[in-house]
Amino acid sequence: LKTLNIIKPDDWHLHLREGLVLKNIIQFTSEYFGRAIVMPNTKSPITSINSAISYRKSIVEALPESSKFEPLMTIYLTDDTDKGELINGFKNNVFFAAKLYPANATTNSSHGVRKIENLYKIFELMQDSGMPLLIHGEVTDSEVDVFDREEVFIDKELSQITKRFPKLKIVLEHITTSYAVDFVQENNIGATITPHHLHINRNAMFFGGLNSDFYCLPVAKRENNRLALR
């Protein structure tokens, strides 16, 4: 096989947000993608079956007429996530996956998890049920350099999760480092990569001044990391 034509791919990491932003983005996404995993970090995070159903309804209502686009909903994990809500939502096809945000790691993540090991019972249930875990893989400790947050997260948190739950379906989201590439290849997990991190290295943020348009979380890294991602 020399050529693979993907007629209508899936988007495995989509932020639709809310209101007018949602209505604008969904027009473009539904034109080019058949399905998408919808991130749950809205201003009021998607933490329950009812909130996921309501959010999905607003997405479907914003779709162009005759669109067959399918939004795949996720639940936002918190320190207080209800085990029954999580598993019932997955078994009844409300949730496609669960998303782990370390608290304050990125946009609308203030409700995220503050101590990941407190979710180990949740992870065990997810492993047993086959529910995927999607992870924003960065620590938020103030003493850790912003460019090292992914690597430290892998060593401190993800390595422990993969050892304790070897059959848990894990996706390390939007990886940015060669360290993450190596970890994914050496372990039974998947990863997503953004076009942004394939296209630029961290120099782009500072070349000729401060270029805020190139800033995102996780931040872009050195050129050797960009090449490893490619």
Regions found by a protein language model. Name each.
Residues 26, 49-60, 86, 119-123, ...:
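Generic structural signal for well-ordered alpha-helices
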Residues 81-100, 108-230:
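Histidine/acidic residue-rich metal-binding segments in metalloenzymes
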Residues 10-12, 25-51, 66-78, 94-108, ...:
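Divalent metal-dependent hydrolysis catalytic cores, especially in the metallo-beta-lactamase
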Residues 14-18:
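Short, glycine-rich nucleotide/cofactor-binding loops
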Residues 19-21, 142:
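A generic structural signal for solvent-exposed, polar alpha-helical segments
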Residues 21, 25, 225:
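Catalytic-loop motifs flanking and including active-site residues across diverse enzymes
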Residues 1-5:
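Histidine-rich, glycine-flanked metal-binding segment
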Residues 30, 56, 60-63, 90, ...:
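N-terminal cationic-hydrophobic initiation segments that often serve targeting/anchoring roles
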